Amino acid sequence: MKKFVGAHVSASGGVRNAPLNAQKIGAKAFALFTKNQRQWSAKALEEEEIEQFKANLKAAGIAPSCVLPHDSYLINLGHPGEAELAKSREAFLDEMRRCEQLGLDRLNFHPGSHLGAISESECLSRVAESINLALEATSGVIAVIENTAGQGSNVGYDFRHLGEIIDQVHDKSRVGICIDTCHMFSAGYDIRTREAYEASMAILDREVGWCYLKGMHLNDSKVKFQSRVDRHHSLGMGELGIAPFEFIMNDPRMDGIPLILETIDEALWAQEITLLYSLIKE
């Protein structure tokens, strides 16, 4: 059973530092922002930065397929406004190209929000069209849609939404999903008992399909079941407890993909990584 656990590490001072930061906490996978996530534009990646990133990744012994970059929080690929949608699509394409340059094969993103101006279905179609445009203009990078907690007007809280987006994506080989444990719990998919876990995962398989799972975010939840609020907590300190993470660490369906902590206390990441590996039953 091959599990690749890590965390969303800092790329402060340049993306080259991210693999080193991952290595320091004993990670076998990691997530990063390839640019400032709170700004629209960023200067292009320099060749030296790209080469150093690849060298550090190799030195850390982490495969490119175990890196799950996250796009900017500003991007809304389902935006109801035409000008804003175009701006988001341009920014997303830039992020896809950055992944391409860094030799990474996936980019994780939140699907988007309808902002109360269009229907959920229309929003999902816009997200799918945004993905199609980005895939046509790039090669080799998979667009990885993350499930959401369903806060505000965010789409993607219902697994059916993820399936609906994928149905409309032309190149199915370059689209996938990332499942966040905190988000799914907050959206109404229970995973606290073995029975609940299997039932929720069966819904995921039915609505989307296991073949599309390209990563997971392992987070406990500060908020109660079905609260539709996105508040992460450290493992075992929130409403989920340790059991769901034991189920995941012993589930062969989660083999070979990046399993990423986005828990709130980064001082605990090394401990949490050790804890997760200790849950594996031989």
Curated annotation (Swiss-Prot):
Major enzyme class: hydrolase
Residues that coordinate or bind Zn(2+) 2: 146, 180, 217, 262
Keyword Nuclease: yes
MF terms (GO), sorted A to Z: deoxyribonuclease IV (phage-T4-induced) activity; DNA binding; DNA-(apurinic or apyrimidinic site) endonuclease activity; phosphoric diester hydrolase activity; zinc ion binding
Pfam families: AP_endonuc_2 (PF01261)
InterPro entries: AP_endonuc_2, AP_endonuc_F2_Zn_BS, Xyl_isomerase-like_sf, Xyl_isomerase-like_TIM-brl
Record field: catalytic activity: Endonucleolytic cleavage to 5'-phosphooligonucleotide end-products
Keywords from the UniProt entry: DNA damage, DNA repair, Endonuclease, Hydrolase, Metal-binding, Nuclease, Zinc
NCBIfam families, per the entry: nfo, PRK01060.1-4
Function: Endonuclease IV plays a role in DNA repair. It cleaves phosphodiester bonds at apurinic or apyrimidinic (AP) sites, generating a 3'-hydroxyl group and a 5'-terminal sugar phosphate.
Protein's recorded name: Probable endonuclease 4
Origin species: Wolinella succinogenes (strain ATCC 29543 / DSM 1740 / CCUG 13145 / JCM 31913 / LMG 7466 / NCTC 11488 / FDC 602W) (Vibrio succinogenes)
Taxonomy of the source species: Bacteria, Pseudomonadati, Campylobacterota, Epsilonproteobacteria, Campylobacterales
Gene symbol of the encoding locus: nfo
